[in-house]
């Protein structure tokens, strides 16, 4: 992630400098940006757990701008979103593709949003295998299991039938924010921040 901006606030004790991510965290905003891998997922999970410990009743905003990434890493974020007590509101800024779109759809019902020019894309899991035939079969079975799991969760989150999800995720399926709302992945397209 290159350059990280800092913000300066005046307090009773003088000026205080925060990196922008720490300052956002203070307002219960978590930013998921870039490819989802184990390192990124661990950081997101830690922030969600920290915010729950700070206030288990207050919503958390998860802002997503991601092309997707590793399925198991994304599922660790998904499980944590469901494990913690606060509602997690999801907001797509830019793009939510693959695992990014999956997590976008997993926000608390009624609290899944997108900015108007964002792009959302769902598809089936990607993977590859090499080695002995028995190893390839094991990996293939695991990918198919994950495909079934993710399709089932997407169907539950969107209100689409499992058959429709399977058909639509067979290839890359791109949507505008408006189309994602009609599909059921989000609840509202935001024009202005009302805070």
Swiss-Prot record:
GO BP terms, alphabetized: protein quality control for misfolded or incompletely synthesized proteins
UniProt-annotated catalytic positions: 98 (nucleophile), 123
Residue stretches in coiled coil: none
Gene3D superfamilies xref list: 2-enoyl-CoA Hydratase, Chain A, domain 1
Family matches, as CDD domains: S14_ClpP_2
Reactions catalysed: Hydrolysis of proteins to small peptides in the presence of ATP and magnesium. alpha-casein is the usual test substrate. In the absence of ATP, only oligopeptides shorter than five residues are hydrolyzed (such as succinyl-Leu-Tyr-|-NHMec, and Leu-Tyr-Leu-|-Tyr-Trp, in which cleavage of the -Tyr-|-Leu- and -Tyr-|-Trp bonds also occurs)
Any one Gene Ontology molecular-function term assigned to this protein's record: ATP-dependent peptidase activity
Compartment(s) of residence: Cytoplasm
Classification via InterPro entries: ClpP (IPR001907), ClpP/crotonase-like_dom_sf (IPR029045), ClpP/TepA (IPR023562), ClpP_His_AS (IPR033135), ClpP_Ser_AS (IPR018215)
UniProt enzyme class: hydrolase
PROSITE patterns listed in its UniProt record: CLP_PROTEASE_HIS, CLP_PROTEASE_SER
Keywords, comma-separated and alphabetical: Cytoplasm, Hydrolase, Protease, Serine protease
Recorded GO CC terms: cytoplasm; endopeptidase Clp complex
EC number: 3.4.21.92
Protein purpose: Cleaves peptides in various proteins in a process that requires ATP hydrolysis. Has a chymotrypsin-like activity. Plays a major role in the degradation of misfolded proteins.
Record HAMAP family: ClpP
SUBUNIT field: Fourteen ClpP subunits assemble into 2 heptameric rings which stack back to back to give a disk-like structure with a central cavity, resembling the structure of eukaryotic proteasomes.
Protein name: ATP-dependent Clp protease proteolytic subunit
Organism per entry: Helicobacter pylori (strain J99 / ATCC 700824) (Campylobacter pylori J99)
Lineage: Bacteria, Pseudomonadati, Campylobacterota, Epsilonproteobacteria, Campylobacterales
């Amino acid at each position: 992630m290159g350059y990280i901006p800092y913000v300066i606030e005046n307090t009773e004790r003088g000026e205080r400098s925060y990196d922008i991510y720490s300052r956002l965290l203070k307002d219960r905003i978590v930013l998921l940006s870039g490819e989802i891998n184990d390192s990124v997922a661990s950081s997101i999970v830690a922030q969600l757990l920290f915010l729950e410990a700070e206030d288990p009743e207050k919503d958390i905003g998860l802002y997503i701008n991601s092309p997707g990434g590793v399925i198991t890493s994304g599922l660790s974020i998904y499980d944590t979103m469901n494990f913690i007590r606060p509602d997690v509101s999801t907001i797509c800024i830019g793009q939510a593709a693959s695992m990014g779109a999956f997590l976008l759809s997993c926000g608390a019902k009624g609290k899944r949003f997108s900015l108007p020019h964002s792009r959302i894309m769902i598809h089936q899991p990607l993977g590859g295998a090499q080695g002995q035939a028995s190893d390839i079969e094991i990996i293939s079975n695991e990918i198919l299991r994950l495909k079934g799991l993710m399709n089932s969760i997407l169907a539950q989150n969107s209100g689409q039938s499992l058959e429709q999800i399977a058909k639509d995720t067979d290839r890359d399926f791109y949507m505008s924010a408006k189309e994602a709302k009609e599909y059921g992945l989000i609840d509202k397209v935001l024009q202005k921040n009302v805070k």
